[in-house]
């Protein structure tokens, strides 16, 4: 990773690790040299970071809103000290949150700290089937509340009306930037934003059905100090900086290949990850399932997994992925937070043990799982490389012992993602 004291243009705060990589991937595709930090960088790491965009990955999506606000404001302060011209708060394209927060509370705090009176909220990601119309979020052809997300173990999404969902999380007035305004182009969006501001609206859910809509929104909001949303909303941001003559034309995705062993670790219970695990099993590739009840009983699950990986003689999948019914049964017995925390901790310990055994390439499925794994591996900075599947790039860590990682949000990736990611990480991804 080259270093030269360049001033970053865009500062990003992501509420989980895979969301951060998703956003960083989008920015790299737009030509911005992007570095992802696991938490707020230390002074040593920060010295001379050479990047057009810096994405700080927090683990705040499901933390109490007061904690999420404090962490996000600390990240904001760090980014502003580096001279970032615009701030982007990234959350999931399925708006993962509850009435307790914390998308609204964090957005509210960032707005106030930036002394701004308005921001957009747009989690749309059409390339992955997430679209918004009349304020309602769709996943493919289904409303969010009927897409399987209503069964999410930590943030069950039972309402697709994002205006209503966001309003429950903030004291500020929430409005809607409807599609008919977006269809009028950049000036139409700017005019509608002016009207919303005059009505006392501080946050507006923005409709978006296509990438073209996201480019329109991005251009229209070039002067807003804060934007919030999914990675899709960042599509148009590199173009704004390029138009202003602030962005160089280079290959932002260039990376080196990393040699060593490889593994797939999956903790997500999402529909997509369940399909990816099934595809691996159908190919008769070696896999070991971790049972949270065994962890709770004190069985040597981590040691068994490390032995399994060592003796397999080929790349293995170690997974805790389960169906929604199985997840609910475990949660009923162990509790929601305890069951998830135990799985994350175990997969983190397994990753650390595999690192000590020579594994250097890690494919990880699930936002919470990815957070646990990168922390266990001691990863602090990631250089973002080429895209594997929409929203998921290959990455390489900095430091004396570089690692190649693919950190996948639970619901992202094609059915053959695991095999595809391993292949890309093994090359000059």
UniProtKB/Swiss-Prot annotation:
EC number: 2.7.1.217
Catalytic activity: 3-dehydro-L-erythronate + ATP = 3-dehydro-4-O-phospho-L-erythronate + ADP + H(+); 3-dehydro-D-erythronate + ATP = 3-dehydro-4-O-phospho-D-erythronate + ADP + H(+)
Binding site for ATP: 268, 366-369, 410
SUPFAM superfamilies documented for this protein: YgbK-like
Record has DNA-binding as a keyword: no
Protein keywords: ATP-binding, Carbohydrate metabolism, Kinase, Nucleotide-binding, Transferase
Coiled-coil segments: none
SS bond list: none
Keyword Thylakoid: no
InterPro entries tied to this protein: 4-carb_acid_sugar_kinase_N, 4-carb_acid_sugar_kinase_N_sf, NBD_C, NBD_C_sf, OtnK
One annotated GO molecular function: kinase activity
Name of one Pfam family that matches: SBD_N
Domain of life assignment: Bacteria
Broad EC category: transferase
NCBIfam families: OxoTetrKin
Protein purpose: Catalyzes the ATP-dependent phosphorylation of 3-oxo-tetronate to 3-oxo-tetronate 4-phosphate.
Family of the protein in this entry: Belongs to the four-carbon acid sugar kinase family.
Protein name: 3-oxo-tetronate kinase
Organism: Pseudomonas savastanoi pv. phaseolicola (strain 1448A / Race 6)
Gene field: otnK
